[in-house]
Amino acid sequence: MRNIDVTPRPLAELASHLSDAATKRLDAVVDAGRRLGQGRTIFNITPSAAADSGVAEAVETITALALDAGIDTRWYQLDMPAPFRVLSERLDNWLHGYDGDGGVLRDKERDLYEHVLSSNAENLVDEISNGDIVVLHEAATAGLAQAFSEAGAWVVWRCHGGTEDLNEHSQLAWSFLEPYLDWANRMVFTRDVYRPPFAPPDSCDVIAPSIVPDSPKNRVLDLDESLSIVRLAGIFDGVAPFDAVPFIREDGRPGVIEKLDGVMLAGGPVPQGARVVTQVSRWSALKGNVQLIEAFAADRELLADDVH
């Protein structure tokens, strides 16, 4: 397991996006966090710390803000051999109701899961003190709950996805994870309907999805910046107001968006002045891209002729 260095991020940056009432609520939560965290360490454990991981982005931000608040918070990433990484993605897909790579969850997969997580637990368990809080993120980490619970930690398992319509795949994934989650003190879901049948409601909490407002991908773009990016990419027809659009990367390094030649298009650029239905996400079955296209096609007659 690898410790991820995190630079504290001023809470004032977050407060600048909030109303006065929301800022007061934030201050109250931070004060409560300081009291509850006194004498304790909070460990966040994620499968990945990659920049393209939404979970990693959220954990990095929360950890940075907590450090600024004076709360002892640490972030660790699993050591995952390639077969375990495949299994992790399979579990994630199945919890969402998708068959993913078409693989299975049998004794061989369980042996791999337990072996890898046992090795990871050994790397960290000696640092756990009685009363510490360990937050395990996603299916790949659920198997760590027993080791950290037996070490005296309060264990929280955080599930960042799911499906409201249980099917064969999601039921099998929950059956796979259930014996490990019996060791968790609490479970946190993004929606109450994602809670599995075996999880007692009074042991679960719901935290809605959120974004990092100061992240480069979430910052507000003015109209000229927006038009420049989509025209430089060839998505919209017309001349870009700017030849390049500068931005600051997550790690503070400067970057620039110039002409983009590798963008995949179907049917050519959108004509000037046309209205557009847009989804911005990575291309993944879990993001609903295909469903958006299907919904657009099914209801095309309800939209104006110039809508793309």
What are these model-predicted stretches?
Residues 1-308:
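Catalytic cores of nucleotide-sugar-dependent glycosyltransferases that transfer UDP/GDP/TDP-activated
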